Amino acid sequence: MMARRTLKAVLIDLSGTLHIEDTAVPGAQEALARLRQAPVAVKFVTNTTKECKRTLFERLRGLNFDLQQQEIFTSLTAARNLVEQKAVRPLLMVEDSALEDFTGLETSDPNAVVIGLAPDHFNYQTLNKAFQLILDGAPLIAIHKARYYKKKDGLALGPGPFVTGLEYATDTKATVVGKPEKGFFLEALRDLNCSPEEAVMIGDDARDDVGGAQNAGMLGILVKTGKYRPADEGKINPPPHLTCASFPEAVNYILDHLLGSK
């Protein structure tokens, strides 16, 4: 691993780290405001596929978070980029609220399958259509493969089990574009003019947020909010650089120990 350099960027997960549905993590807005005063770039990286970037931005602004829409990098964006690179016509297995981020793509007579979190579309008919397309040679593009995510009433199935089911049934492997893929983190850093060794990631998912970031060369800070479950930090190797109670505590650590100022 390359030597650590001066911290230049902080990547922050959204759902489970800054907010859970329409409720902010206590103290998160104030902590973000303090981080904004430090000499680091801030970017928000998310696997959220339930809604388009614009809706997500409006939700966060409604919770009084200080951010700009262009600071949000989503796995939907990464998926669209790959679809355009491959010049394919996707069957979009995403919620209707996320379709805005795919506006302009040709989707008639699909020859590829793009799957995200789509509870309203995870039925036999749609899954079987995807199954048949893949058997006919269509590539399977997974926006991400999270096992589950946090809702107010508990944990809920993520897209991962459905992606894995299609992989199993068709004896193929999906191309995954979201966290924890190394390429996702590198793409998120690209316009920040910094290397992974100059960045830290904060998130509630040990595998996808912290493990993925550290595999890309970043530091990873795991927070015990959102989908975190006891002993999650022991599920990745190397373990998180730091595990702390919540986002405000992670910001305190960054200001005190990685930047040396509060």
From Swiss-Prot:
GO terms for molecular function: metal ion binding; phosphatase activity. Keywords: Magnesium, Metal-binding. Binds 1 Mg(2+) ion per subunit. InterPro entries: HAD-like_sf, HAD-SF_hydro_IIA, HAD_sf, LHPP/HDHD2. GO terms for cellular component: cytoplasm. Belongs to the HAD-like hydrolase superfamily. This is Haloacid dehalogenase-like hydrolase domain-containing protein 2. It comes from Danio rerio (Zebrafish). The lineage of its organism: Eukaryota, Metazoa, Chordata, Craniata, Vertebrata.
